[in-house]
Amino acid sequence: MKLTTKMPKGERIVSEIKKKIEEGTLQEGDRVSTVREMTKLFDTSVSVVQNALQSLVKDKYLECKGKSGYYVRKQAAKKAVETAAEEQTEQNKPIPFIVIHHNDLVWRRNFDEYDEIRRKQIKLELEMSRKDPRFTFGIEQSAVLERYAEQEPGDVKYLQQLIDEGRLEPSGAFSIQDLNLVSGEAILMCHLHGKKYYKEVWGCDTPVASLTDAFGLCSQIPQILALSGFQYLIPGRLNNRDQKALPFPADGVFRWIGLDGTPIYVTAREGRYTGHGIGREGGSVVNTDNVTRVTNMLADAQNDPSDYIMIYTTEEALIIENLSEIMDNLNRKAARKIAYQNAKTYFEAAEKENIPQVYGEFNPTLTGCYTTRISVKMDNRKAENQIFEAELLDLYRKGKSKDFTPVWKQLYLIGFHDAICGCHTDHANEQIREKLDYVLKETAPAKANLKDGTFTVFAMNQKNGIQLASAPVPPAGIPSQKDGDAYLFEFDGAFTVKKYQTAKKKPAAAKKCSAKFETDYYKVNFSNGIARIENKNGKNVFGNDFGELVLRPEYGTMWQEEYKGAKIVRRDDTEEKLVSCEEGPVFFKVVTEGFIKDGLPEIGNIDNHWPGFESLSFRKEYIFPKHADHFKLKLTVDFHGRNTKTYINFPTTVDCHTAHPLYQVPFGSMERKPYFEIPSNETDSAQFLAHQSDYESAKGDWPALNWVDYSDGNGGLTVANNGTPSHQLKSGNIMVALLRSGTRILDGNLMPEVGSFENGIHEYEFAFQAHQTQDVTKAEQLGQLVNHPARVIAETLPEGDVLSFSQENVAISAIRKSENGILVRVYETQGRYASISMSGSLLKGKTVFNAEADGTVLEKENAAELNFKPFEIRTFILK
């Protein structure tokens, strides 16, 4: 039975009369309809009409003059008109309206195909702007405008005219990157590039950033945008938002406070878009006519008194050519008008005092993206690492400095959200791989000349204490040990250079040893092929079966996980054996190999264990330095099949009820509680996502960059990686996602292709460090160690510390040449105020200046006293 609710007739009479008074249809002294007339008009009884009229008399809207009838009171008419005028002023405020295509640079088509799509879109917008001098449109990435100007140089003059008039609004960075999977330095550089291009080429200093469709917003985005010169943001997904501070829907703008306290003004209604597609009303009425769809959405907007900017967007389609005609027709019928306006004007006029304030991040969402096509993410990390080292070493190369701008531009394209997330076609992936190959080639380390019997090692990481350096030849005078094609030896010094003589004799080969051994820091036992590890200092933080592989059936899309059934493959379904255990003068090396045993399809009806899974084998190579406070694991996995998600599990003894799960984020770290599949007795360890719809796109994982750390009051464990961002720190376990291969269709009706399943061999590297107290600086150092190990360099550098700080809570993000000197960018890692001195050979003969993020020199600084706010990003120029 369908239930309907109607307003009682007496209330309806009151409402209608009040409305006519407020609209001015009934003026002061006017007589309202008679009781008899109203009984017919409203189809009701005399008593209902009389009660309604008496109610209006009581509220001082009407006065009764006996047999003459009821009349509008003077005070009521005046008050109603004033109130209505105030409301009319707000409600009649024009709706700012702009056309901004969301231009995917790569996704279900490749880069070249999207170039042509955008060319046609912008051509049409230029035609429409010539026909209608009001028409206003925007471009959300500088890569789009830059490419179009190359394609259509004849339009450049007119583009400039539109920009000068405010009818074409450039906004945002070079590209809209994924803000969880690329480094903070890459995000900042990408925004600086976009800002610089708009300013230098078009004379446009846009204050509006655009991150539409970004898969989550990390907590340092406000500071990054502010450092790049942006004041306002058109956001992407605002997932897991604080519902009290920012309910959905919310109007106007809100103030987003980042990790360091920097604010940015953001449009609140991320859903305020109109576009094409299939519009459904209650699942029954379907509208596929884009003209009708856009018309109806704009008409609906005219009935909404809220303060917002309306954005008409498509991805690949052309916009409706008669848009201005539709708008004019609607404006003739409605009190609230729609008016073309750019986002800057909207933001500048928006209320900014009594507005919501939101802190932190907008994560997680589309968590499958953290693992899909893992090789793209791992090679992007490698490319970021190499460009950091290449720019640093370029300071010491002879001759003309290398221009890294073309390399950075390709890296921005790789970091585009639909590229690095892996959710694209195999055809698109080919071009992404080409760009990765280009960046890796252009930043590859120069080959050192070893013929003179000497070599130089540079530890481009801030790890204090002993670490292992590698060289293609053994050093003289100190112990070394061969591992593959390299010789490993102890190196002590953070961001330090040392020179070595080449040994005349190769060291003796490592010898077979017991599977049970000790280093200065760890007790290790591989007697049955399964890792049993204990730290020797303080409470043991290692759990049993360290490095266990965990597989589960996963039938999601490339973006979203979807788990079917409870079948999980773990140790009981795994065959693993000890292959070798060796000892040399520098380290112990343990190798195990194994595979997932065949099993019946308990979940589903075909294949091995479940539909889609075929096989997985693996090899683990552990390196335990004898005198270092950490150890490493090289994991090789050979996977075949689909519909499978693979983790490696590092169990700990951390008490999940009092634990602090920390994840490195761009330019900082955040504590994030588990939120999915929480055991019923551990709900006190969890957080719950703000809205049930958040769970549709998030299934347990959180993103991290170089490291995660899991600790309680008695100690903890840091795990560093070389490009595997997807983690779960839950129930005392550190789970790292290695591979996933969902087969379901989602956005763009993309059928996941064979390439997205990543069948074949994959290599991963991890490092581990137990600790007794939570210390983010040690985690930061371990993450740097994995990604920038001490190695031989071809360049000539003075021995000693290149750059050092008096405290450990400052991390180096970049060292490169700039127009004004040497740019050094660092950030505070522990979330505390600090006064720190900076020293090292890099500063020799140079003065330190505070600088803008783009290298613009500001005031002189005292290198002996550099002040940092919590999580502050600072840029210095040395000259």
Q: Where are these predicted regions, by residue range?
A:
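Extreme N-terminal segment that seeds HTH/winged-HTH DNA-binding domains in transcriptional regulators
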Residues: 1-47, 51-54, 78-83
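HTH-adjacent hinge/linker in prokaryotic transcriptional regulators
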Residues: 54-89
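N-terminal catalytic cores of secreted or lumenal carbohydrate-active enzymes
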Residues: 85-182, 186-189, 198-200, 227, ...
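Catalytic-core regions of glycoside hydrolase
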Residues: 158-171, 177-356, 647-649
